[in-house]
Amino acid sequence: MSMITERPVSDTAGQSVGATDGTVGKRREIPAVVAAYVALTKPRIVELLLVTTVPAMMLAHGGLPPLWLVAVVLVGGSLAAGAASVLNCYIDRDIDQVMRRTKRRPLPTHTVSPRNALIFGLVLATVSVTLLAVFTNALAAGLTLGAILYYDLIYTAWLKRTTTANTFWGGACGAAPVLIGWAAVTGSLAPAAWALFGVVFFWQMPHFYPLAMKYKDDYARAGIPMLPVVASTRRVNAEILVFAWLTVLVSLVAWPLGLGPVYGLPTLVVGAVFLIEAHKLCRRASRGEAVKPMRLFHWSTTYLTVVFAAVALDALI
């Protein structure tokens, strides 16, 4: 569900009139192809996942972990998230080409072939799992492999296309980096790790439902049964509010599990604003007024960033 759109490569980029023109064309094509492969990894999603990983590692360690371990997890986690996204693009190439939001991605524009995308995704997945297995531990590597397989084979290939609860069931994948980061440090999973996992898990519904509201017609055109596409406004509002409240409540459950006021106070404040924005959106939607769902979408990103920044700061103090 990346917001990234890509500019297609010109159909004449690789054609040549003469030897010199052909060489220049190929040289110009290389950056575009590299950019296309990078776009397949959905860098913005990778960035958001890493925002949750490092603070979880810091809390698990009780401070800043060894820099080499942080580097390994960041590289391995980035490759894993990128692999999952590339394979997602490969599986979803049929629906991406009919959605306005995604039709300029590399596969619909034929900038990258499906075969090459599949190979690229599998290579990234193999390297990421191997890296974590060699330099961290079996639990972190196993969680990474499980997250990739679940996201692509269970969520993308099956649940996304068949159930209105697709966002809920896919939420475990988005929250997995918290567990992976924690496991890389300790080799186990403590209650605090599961609490932070819960925050990210529940957060994804009030984060992604507004996106689906904005692109409702796009998802309908592709036949994807996102909740805002097929359910009533009342049902969508109820789920946004229930999961927004669960997100904030679980974030407070994490407070006594090794965190202090440096975490708790900012979390209370930003949580209150997050809930206010969720209620505003739902109130306007229920009245049939014009809504700006992306306001909650962006606010939810701010919320998660502040909460995990507070986790990191608390772990350092």
UniProtKB/Swiss-Prot annotation:
Q: Where in the cell is it found?
A: Cell membrane
Keywords, in A-Z order: Cell membrane, Heme biosynthesis, Membrane, Transferase, Transmembrane, Transmembrane helix
- Chief localization class? membrane
Q: Name one GO cellular component term.
A: plasma membrane
Question: What is the catalytic activity of this protein?
Answer: heme b + (2E,6E)-farnesyl diphosphate + H2O = Fe(II)-heme o + diphosphate
The protein's annotated pathway: Porphyrin-containing compound metabolism; heme O biosynthesis; heme O from protoheme: step 1/1
Which leading EC class covers this enzyme?
A: transferase
Tell whether RNA-binding is among the UniProt keywords: no
Q: Does the keyword Transmembrane apply?
A: yes
In alphabetical order, the GO MF annotations are: protoheme IX farnesyltransferase activity
Q: Which residues cross the membrane?
A: 45-65, 67-87, 116-136, 139-159, 182-202, 240-260, 262-282, 297-317
What is the recorded function of this protein according to its Swiss-Prot or TrEMBL entry? Answer: Converts heme B (protoheme IX) to heme O by substitution of the vinyl group on carbon 2 of heme B porphyrin ring with a hydroxyethyl farnesyl side group.
Q: Which family does it belong to?
A: Belongs to the UbiA prenyltransferase family. Protoheme IX farnesyltransferase subfamily.
Q: What else is known?
A: Carbon 2 of the heme B porphyrin ring is defined according to the Fischer nomenclature.
Q: What is this protein called?
A: Protoheme IX farnesyltransferase
**Origin species:** Salinispora arenicola (strain CNS-205)
